Amino acid sequence: QAARERRLPKLLVLEDLRGELHGHTTWSDGTASVMEMAEAARRRGYQYWGVTDHSVGLGVVQGVDGERLRRQRQEIDAANAHFAVQGIDFHLLQGSEVEILADGSLGLPDEVLKTLDVAVASIHSAQRQDRETITARCLKAVYNPYIDILGHPTGRLLGSRPPTELDVERVLQACAETGTVVEINANPARLDLNDVYARRAVELGCKIAINCDAHATDGMDILEYGIATAR
């Protein structure tokens, strides 16, 4: 009936996205340099790309602390200057995927977070905490004024790890209240938020960011899966 009455919504398509705000380079666990990832993003028609290497606090990779972020900023500024001189409409943003530690504290202090263009807060450890503990932990990050995006909120890995016990409804309500953006992680192993929670996020008034969480130049090829979830 909606089709007959021409009331079908205009759904998101790949070409609607102008960039991503969550990706990694050789500064942490990525396999390509800042410039290599930037060029890969440009080839996809992006106008911006967020460099969000892991902060300290994630034991499996070398985290980027405040001092290394200052050095990384110089590299990003140089890349942006190169694009500007060439008249290229593309801009790198400096950020961090900030670890939400087991006690709810963050892998970077506020004085560092406030210098970033974008901060993505994510949980990678202690994922079997009980519902109240992990929800309070996540909410602490959401209410931090320097956190912009909540990354892969439920932590699931399809086929290998179930989602955490997170009270997603409470967290989405907090994101709507604070303006914290909620991620749809396009990695086919994650697709997190899933379609049901993504719809609920929109109903509550949350903003959504679709990111590939790319760790290599071809890691941006999976964006369509995030688009499909959003649709």
Regions of interest found by a model, annotated:
Residues 1-25, 31-51, 55-90, 102-231:
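Charged catalytic cores and adjacent phosphate/nucleic-acid-binding surfaces used
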Residues 93:
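General small-molecule cofactor/ligand-binding pocket signal
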Residues 97-101:
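Active-site beta-strand->loop->alpha-helix modules in alpha/beta enzyme cores, enriched
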